């Protein structure tokens, strides 16, 4: 038969376990809500920063087009114009290509290749063949005014253009910013129109740079995703019937979704997915300190109580 001390000890163990389990359950219920709320707040904060950074990127492209225009002031000779554009492109790795419509309506295209070499295509007659530097025909009967970067933009306003098929890069999409030469600039430049195309690799790397390793970030134009960060490139992204995207991975991560247009550029949309609250997230470790402290206190109280009872029963046994 169990002694009175052992019976009391068993009851103390049961009470301790019940208290510990009740506390653990209550802690996880409360902390789960806190973690979820903190995740939403962090997602809002991160998305606000992402929006600003993406907006800065597109503004930089626009400023680059203006800088390119400034470098062409008073240049009338086509060789001087070519040298000026190539020099600027070497300083602007985020540009894939630059196109110029000269004041005589002839077209020049400066295209960056995989080895970072910039090749030049040009027209020797208006709407005629586009040829390379050796005179080889690249595109017959090329009409710049029929290209998407020209048709989608107004004759007076500078604008971004929807993604279109690059004629010099089969299977790839181009996104262009078109700069129109108007007013007094028209008298100082031998150019009527400039378009600059984004470098896709550079844009993807930029999204990598501004996002964290556990965040999914991509840009959309129309129904097409035009750029992704590293995690977005690794995951399966499925467009659903509700007009949103499902992020599929092997661990079924829950994400907080945030979307908006690029600041001051409604043509492009930002899709941002922040990982939902995780009770085991290292960023929440401070909330586990009170939990660990109370468990330790309960354990100490239990050990002290059993020790006191053991001593009392020992003294009673000695008296008997």
How should each PLM-predicted stretch be described?
Residues 55-91, 99-105:
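Extracellular/periplasmic ligand-binding regions of membrane signal-transduction receptors
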Residues 123-195:
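Extracytoplasmic/periplasmic ligand-binding sensor regions of membrane-associated signaling proteins
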Residues 63, 90-108, 113-129, 154-160, ...:
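Short N-terminal helix-loop-first-beta-strand/juxtamembrane motif that initiates sensory/input modules
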Residues 29-63, 75:
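Juxtamembrane membrane-water interface segments immediately C-terminal to a transmembrane helix
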Residues 1-41, 291-303:
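Extreme N-terminal signal-anchor transmembrane helix of membrane signaling/transducer proteins, especially
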Residues 78-94, 185-187, 191-233, 242-243:
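Solvent-exposed, extracytoplasmic
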Residues 182-185, 230-290:
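Extracellular/periplasmic juxtamembrane segments that couple receptor/chemosensory ectodomains to their
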Residues 17, 21, 218, 269-320:
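Cytoplasm-proximal transmembrane signaling helix
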